[in-house]
């Protein structure tokens, strides 16, 4: 097992990608701490993991409240005795035209997605440094750190900020055996996809559009993202730090979607 007896904290662990991350880390032998703003859904996830033989502890924590993040660290050490890894997965977003963004909405996104991620990264890194055994931190960012969509300014600002401080942290913490990497997923089969489909004329039309913009011609799955996280948390990636890895089936490498007039139909002449 790749994460045997390692204690891994996973934020946003009550739904979507966080659930798959928690399940996969537990399958790989980790002692998992899952967090979210409320305990209700966390408990359901924890019950499922325990039923499969995994070790997990649900803990309430709001990423925008520094005192709750400090309490999370304290309780994790009380329950499991160490912190070996962190997946900063929690995040929120308000989709709104740039000219209509409310400063309070802007601040709320940054408080959770950027400031909360920074605080928890720092708290975990301090504990890893004190313990002297190193560790691995994985920040869940987005393809939005490479390119944008209309209405995503607060989210984009936060995720690009996460990439920035994580690279700086990776440089400083490498000497202590602490690795910091960023995983930027593309379009994934989660609740967000359901929201996208709900706003489209039809599911088929929506899927056809996105397939045309993804070289792999499908959505990525939560399990695929979770397996990437396990790799980055494990010793298999011991030489990787400061990287922003795009798990997007080639989405960010595509210049323009497939069209009848795309480059494959153009015969270049010699200059």
Question: Which positions does each model-derived feature cover?
Answer:
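Conserved glycine-rich cofactor-binding loop
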Residues: 12-16
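Active-site helix of classical SDR
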Residues: 121, 158, 166
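Residue(s) in the substrate-gating loop at a strand-loop-helix junction
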Residues: 142
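Short C-terminal tail/terminal secondary-structure segment
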Residues: 230, 241-271
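Substrate-binding pocket helix/loop in short-chain dehydrogenase/reductase
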Residues: 97-98, 102-110, 210
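Alpha-helical segment proximal to the catalytic Tyr-Lys
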Residues: 126, 171-175, 238
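C-terminal substrate-recognition "lid" of short-chain dehydrogenase/reductases
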Residues: 218-247
